Amino acid sequence: MKHLWCICVFFLTSCATKGILETHILQGEPGEVDVIVFSSTDCPIANAMAPEIERIHISVQNAGGDLFLVHVWAGRTNIDAQKHADDYGLTMEVIIDTEHELVDSFNATVTPEAVVVLYDEDGTPKVIYQGLVNNLFDSPGNRRDEATQHYVRDAVAAGIKNEAISTSYRAPTGCIIEQKQ
């Protein structure tokens, strides 16, 4: 039986386009892992991470979980989000969070920022990792040729195996999420 993540009920912009969620309650089976990635259509760091985010999505989906891409900037439309997904080859579900319900629930500060959730034996959700997707960027404008550390991949693998994660938070590098007034 799926359990609900009670603090996260999201009321989102309605959309006829498949893949853009109208409403979603985060829920999962015991031992399942879900990933939330905060993103923006115009953040160059988030866009550079798109291929890795898609690879993580496929891996999480193959393990029975979900990856949700959350667009956080005010003024984004379903059309913007769908065009962005198409342009970058992203196939996961997209959430438009212009009211920052998710941003506030997870205290997200930049895009891209990832949250890995593991559902325990009772189906109760627990954040097991939050922060950097990988180490492709040391800081804005300071990009490696390729990532050498894959923090979200490692957290997902550890969560699936119910193993401890050595570092549950890594300060993310990216475009600052402007707080709602």
Question: Residue spans of the language-model regions?
Answer:
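Sec-dependent N-terminal signal peptides
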Residues: 4-12
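Short active-site neighborhood of thiol/selenol oxidoreductases, capturing the structured segment around
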Residues: 29-44, 156
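Loop/turn elements at helix/coil->beta-strand transitions in domains of secreted/extracellular proteins
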Residues: 31-34, 63-66, 90-92, 111
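Second-shell loop/turn segments in exported
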Residues: 40-42, 69-74, 139-145
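The canonical Cys-X-X-Cys-His
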Residues: 43-46, 114
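Structural microenvironment flanking redox-active thiols in thiol-disulfide oxidoreductases
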Residues: 47-87, 98-105
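Thiol/selenol-based redox catalytic cores and closely related redox-interacting motifs
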Residues: 99-181
